[in-house]
């Protein structure tokens, strides 16, 4: 079966061009302005006039809660939410129960992801057994079982010796190591960033050095080992400065920023609405501005959502006791397009690189991130011209925990295609 996506503004090879895309048998057959030579009488047509046609977005940081907490999210609901947001490839973090920390457990997750996922789900292995021990996993074994990278996300690796051995092992087999950077000895019970706002609200604050101290340590270890070291959800200007310096000096480091750290600061916290509670916590306005600048200067390589659904019960508690995290898959592109591209802070081409091309290339997801003849037809179509209101009733995720509910944005997903199959389509009014 053939599908012709016609008259769209197509992002391809770094350029936005008015052209058509022909999909046949799950792959991209042709891209161009006149594709009639490829057509017969049996094809479907999608008129993408006034719409953006993009490579399917890539999010290397999601939490699908299955197995262990399926009341919060499942592979099916999480991947449906990803498709709703225009994502066709995601990276599933290993903070599930049981933790995928052996080749057998990783293989089980890979098979389950393939069975239940509406999008391509790349699976992380843990770095250490149970994500909290000092025993480094069998890196060669988990890679052979299908892990695309390793991470203990949700916890930082506390012992420098453990991290050094993990980096050596990951480097030996060519696995990226993605780090949740948090020195737990510096938390001091903080539930938000320490500063004027935490003192005003009377909430316990944790200093920003919680993050930057571990970034500094890990960059030294990454330089010593040569591993591909990836910093998850970077959030402070000091961390950015060190990452920028490390890149200039040959360290193989990449990093991601989240939409919420790019768009919100600790000034948004009122002490009651726990939708503003996440980890890393919202930072100072100077950090937020530094993150936005780092999107343009290349310090930040990609945007990842850290999609973290929770039940209303877990998020409805007192701010100090509520769970960390917000949902992100379904709103990320629209929020960033509205708040960064439409305001002139970021070019659309750069946003698409940050959300599709760059993460795919950094993590060697070779079939993702590009529209290319002969490659899988993983495609997202967005409406950049008509505003809509973010409404939790529209979410396909089980989690509705978002501080962005009620915001008017542009960039609604019209259609998402995975391997040539439509996995999400906007309902027309």
Curated annotation (Swiss-Prot):
Its EC number is 3.5.2.3. SUPFAM superfamilies: Composite domain of metallo-dependent hydrolases, Metallo-dependent hydrolases. It comes from Limosilactobacillus fermentum (strain NBRC 3956 / LMG 18251). Binds 2 Zn(2+) ions per subunit. Pathway: Pyrimidine metabolism; UMP biosynthesis via de novo pathway; (S)-dihydroorotate from bicarbonate: step 3/3. One of its GO terms (biological process) is 'de novo' UMP biosynthetic process. The active site is at 306. GO terms for molecular function: allantoinase activity; dihydroorotase activity; zinc ion binding. It is an enzyme of class 3 (hydrolase). Belongs to the metallo-dependent hydrolases superfamily. DHOase family. Class I DHOase subfamily. InterPro entries: Amidohydro-rel (IPR006680), DHOase (IPR004722), DHOase/Allantoinase_Hydrolase (IPR050138), Dihydroorotase_CS (IPR002195), Metal-dep_hydrolase_composite (IPR011059), Metal_Hydrolase (IPR032466). GO terms for cellular component: cytoplasm. Keywords: Hydrolase, Metal-binding, Pyrimidine biosynthesis, Zinc. Catalyzes the reversible cyclization of carbamoyl aspartate to dihydroorotate. Pfam families: Amidohydro_1. Coiled coil: none annotated. Zn(2+) 1 binds at residues 61, 63, 153, 306. This is Dihydroorotase. It catalyses: (S)-dihydroorotate + H2O = N-carbamoyl-L-aspartate + H(+).
